[in-house]
Amino acid sequence: SRQWLFSTNHKDIGTLYFIFGAWAGMVGTSLSILIRAELGHPGALIGDDQIYNVIVTAHAFIMIFFMVMPIMIGGFGNWLVPLMLGAPDMAFPRMNNMSFWLLPPALSLLLVSSMVENGAGTGWTVYPPLSAGIAHGGASVDLAIFSLHLAGISSILGAVNFITTVINMRSTGISLDRMPLFVWSVVITALLLLLSLPVLAGAITMLLTDRNLNTSFFDPAGGGDPILYQHLFWFFGHPEVYILILPGFGMISHIISQESGKKETFGSLGMIYAMLAIGLLGFIVWAHHMFTVGMDVDTRAYFTSATMIIAVPTGIKIFSWLATLHGTQLSYSPAILWALGFVFLFTVGGLTGVVLANSSVDIILHDTYYVVAHFHYVLSMGAVFAIMAGFIHWYPLFTGLTLNNKWLKSHFIIMFIGVNLTFFPQHFLGLAGMPRRYSDYPDAYTTWNIVSTIGSTISLLGILFFFFIIWESLVSQRQVIYPIQLNSSIEWYQNTPPAEHSYSELPLLTN
C-alpha cells in the first residue's frame, strides 16, 4: 500500500528495516546451517568447494549488509534517533525511504549472482586474481559487485541523513555532550560509513573494469598489483567491523543504565570520547588483515601496536558498563541478560582479537578457524546480542505490546548455549591448524566440528523459538500499561506505540 511504499515517516521506515533485516537474517542463518551441515562430518555433503564458497560468501554479505546494518542503523537508528533528539522526523524523509528501497534490489542482485554460472565463490573479501575474469568467468562476481554498489549507496545516503539530522535537529537543551549515547554511536557510525564506503566502491569498480573493460588495476601482467586491492578493501573492511558494533555499544549503554536504575551511564563523556577514538583508530589499522602478504617488519610492528591501542578505548567502555552496574540490585530481565551476555562475550572476542593483533602470531593463525571464532564472538555474540537486547528493551515502545518474559529467558539460555557451543570449539580447531573456507578436513578435526554443528542446530531452534515469541505477542495483543520505570532517556515519554507524528511542537529539555 501507499503508506509503506512511499513512506516518509521515520517510524514506518524503521519498521520496514526491521522486517527486511529479519527476513535477510533468516536467509543468512539458513546459509550458516548449510555450512555447519557440510562441516559436521568429514567428506563431501553438498558438492565441491566452489558451491561451498558461494554459500560462505553469501552468508557473510547477507549477515553484514542485509541483516546487522539494516537492523541496527536502519531499524533502531531510524526509530530512536528522532525520538531521542526531540525531532519530528529525519532531516531528509524521502531520501530515508530511498535508502531502504535500495536494499531489496541489492539483495536480489546478490541472490541472482549465486544462480547464474557457478556463483561468486570468492569469500566476502572478493580478492583478485580469484575474483578476476579467468578464475571467475561469467556474470556472478559482476552481479555481486553491483549488489555491493547499491547497498553502499543506501548506507551513504543514510549516513548523510543521520549526520544532518543530528547537527540540525537537536531539540533546545540537547547540547552535544548531553546527547544520548545511542545517538552518538549512530552519528559516529555514519561518519565511518561516509569515509570508508567510497573506497570500497572505488576498489570494486576497478575490479569490475579489470573484469570487463580490459584494465589492469590488479593484474601484474599490465603493471597492476593485486595487493592494491587488498589495501583498498581493508581500508573499508576494518572500519566496517566497527560500523557493525558501534550502534550496539550505544544500545547496550542505554539498556545497562536503564536496567541498573541509574540516571546515566558511568562516565558518559568518556564513553563518547571512547567511541570517537575507536572510530578514528579503526581507520589506521587495516593492514592487520594482511600480515601474511609480506610487509616490512617495521610496517608490521606499527600495525600490531596500533591495533592493540584500540583495546584501550574498548576497555574504557567495558569497565564503564561494569561501573554502571556497580552497586545495583539487578532484576534479571531478558534485556539485561542479553546486555550482560554482550559484555562478557564481546570481551572474550576482544581478547582473541588482541592475540591476533600480534603479527608474528597472526602469521600462524591467519586463515584458520581461530580467526573465524574471533570475529563470530564479536559479531554473533556482540552485534547480535546487542540487537536482541535492544529489540526486547524497546519492543514495548515500538509496538505498545508485551512479550512473554519467561519464554524470553528460556530463549536467552538456549541461544547462549547454542552460540558458545558453535564457536568456542573453533578456537581449538584454529590452534590445531584447521584452515578457513574449505568444505572438507582431515579426520583429526572431526570431534570439535561435530560439537560446533550441534551448537548451530541449538541456535537455530533458539531463533525459531524467538519468532514464535514475537508471533505470540502480536496475536495476544497485551497492551503495555507503563512501559518502564524511572525513564533515563526521553523516548519513553512517548505513547506506546508513539503517535505517527511525535514532537509536532519543539520540546524544551532542561536539567
From Swiss-Prot:
O2 binds at Y242. Changing Y127F: In strain: Zimbabwe. Cu cation binds at H238, H288, H289. This is Cytochrome c oxidase subunit 1. Its EC number is 7.1.1.9. It is found in: Mitochondrion inner membrane. It catalyses: 4 Fe(II)-[cytochrome c] + O2 + 8 H(+)(in) = 4 Fe(III)-[cytochrome c] + 2 H2O + 4 H(+)(out). Component of the cytochrome c oxidase, the last enzyme in the mitochondrial electron transport chain which drives oxidative phosphorylation. The respiratory chain contains 3 multisubunit complexes succinate dehydrogenase (complex II, CII), ubiquinol-cytochrome c oxidoreductase (cytochrome b-c1 complex, complex III, CIII) and cytochrome c oxidase (complex IV, CIV), that cooperate to transfer electrons derived from NADH and succinate to molecular oxygen, creating an electrochemical gradient over the inner membrane that drives transmembrane transport and the ATP synthase. Its cofactor is heme; Cu cation. It is a multi-pass membrane protein. Pathway: Energy metabolism; oxidative phosphorylation. InterPro entries: Cyt_c_oxase-like_su1_dom, Cyt_c_oxase-like_su1_sf, Cyt_C_Oxase_1, Cyt_c_Oxase_su1_BS, Cyt_c_oxase_su1_dom. Keywords: Calcium, Copper, Electron transport, Heme, Iron, Magnesium, Membrane, Metal-binding, Mitochondrion, Mitochondrion inner membrane, Respiratory chain, Translocase, Transmembrane, Transmembrane helix, Transport. One of its GO terms (molecular function) is metal ion binding. GO terms for cellular component: mitochondrial inner membrane; respiratory chain complex IV. It comes from Drosophila melanogaster (Fruit fly).
